[in-house]
């Protein structure tokens, strides 16, 4: 963090104010975002997470963007919940190549009572490896939320996806208020929140602004804000949707950074379609977190060694864990910058 004066954290953003941010000249917007970013973060550090699909396919939700929905024929087979030991093996590999947070995702509307004990064991096991833990399991009850917190879960991911106004065009099987209720349960249980959205689903700029307003006007900002670019998958209703303009995507990252100055803004799904120049602009706009590994649940992600090569060219280093920044782990992270390793344990949910 630089000596730049801290920027006030707000929870009262209006649509007119956020529109004005989006309408700034591109260079002015990036300058403002970078100034805000430097007030709270080292601009040359990026937090690195790994995401694993622990249960794939046949989700009862009808999210139009998702290849895991049981409503669409995307060629993705239904798979059972992964064994706890296999999850821990993948987590150990993730740590070895530099990840500091391990995220586990399941294609559920909500976790069942029979699966919860295994999920809790996954959390406990990953924590013992010295990694931060994150899960995305769908809607939670208050009791399930507390059980995850008691097991030591650090983050819970539950995206809002888009604005309340556009939401009904994308999902009908879960309400916006249900998503907000799950986030409230997570906060009440003392866990950190990971929540963001997706660009490229046919939404307007006002919808992008509306999503960010919902997140920034929560009583506390999410600690992590993933901004996804739609990955178009054949068989889903959004497979033929128009591509997001790269500059519009960067603008959204920059506005998210300005509105939520203390949050990690994650450059999430869609990086496979981004060239190195676009990713560099994303970091300039204030993105300071990425998913690292071969897969994002069921879609491609840039290979880990390519990420580290890009980091080296840009002078970026992976962010250390504040609580567990031991010398051995940091040395492994630094070594990953110069080595080219292939991950053999990342779960490829879409493989034939």
Swiss-Prot record:
Family annotation (CDD domains): Radical_SAM
Residues passing through the membrane, by range: none
Keywords tagged on the record: 2Fe-2S, 4Fe-4S, Biotin biosynthesis, Iron, Iron-sulfur, Metal-binding, S-adenosyl-L-methionine, Transferase
Cofactors that this protein relies on: [4Fe-4S] cluster; [2Fe-2S] cluster
Biological process annotations from GO: biotin biosynthetic process
Annotated ranges, domain Radical SAM core: 44-262
Superkingdom of this protein's organism: Bacteria
Top-level enzyme category: transferase
EC number assigned by the record: 2.8.1.6
Signal peptide positions on this chain: none
Pathway(s) served: Cofactor biosynthesis; biotin biosynthesis; biotin from 7,8-diaminononanoate: step 2/2
Iron in keyword set: yes
Cofactor note: Binds 1 [4Fe-4S] cluster. The cluster is coordinated with 3 cysteines and an exchangeable S-adenosyl-L-methionine.
GO MF entry, a single one: iron ion binding
PROSITE patterns: RADICAL_SAM
Function according to Swiss-Prot or TrEMBL: Catalyzes the conversion of dethiobiotin (DTB) to biotin by the insertion of a sulfur atom into dethiobiotin via a radical-based mechanism.
HAMAP family cross-referenced by the UniProt entry: BioB
Recorded family membership: Belongs to the radical SAM superfamily. Biotin synthase family.
Name of the protein: Biotin synthase
